Amino acid sequence: MLPVRWMSPESLSDGVFTNQSDVWSFGVLLWEILTLGAKPYPAKSNWEVLQYVRAGGRLERPSGAPERLHVIMSSCWCHVPDDRPSFKMCVQEIECLVESGNGASDMSDGYIRYDG
């Protein structure tokens, strides 16, 4: 069984697995963290997820997630693999977000803030 909910369009269609497809999965992981472990595409079957992602569908912004973090996640889900950021770019963007404190006020109750 394949982890369809974490797979990029090219992985789903062609069985291609690269750093870029891993970045896609990282975006889904960020989404899971911000939803405190919710199942990606919760109302869809694996087959529906496959069709949805192929058609350009993406996960919605989690409630209370900072806009800048959602932009990072969305960039991980670009349809064209070469348009996705590298892991290094993702880390740099997240570090800037954490260091600046921007977006912290957007976090709703129930989210854990780690200052460590």
Language model: regions and residue ranges:
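Structural helix C-cap motif within protein kinase domains
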Residues: T35-K39, V80
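Activation segment
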Residues: D14-N19
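Short proline-rich PxxP-based motifs
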Residues: V53-G64
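Conserved catalytic-loop aspartate of Hanks-type protein kinases
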Residues: D22
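Conserved C-terminal C-lobe helix
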Residues: G64-W77
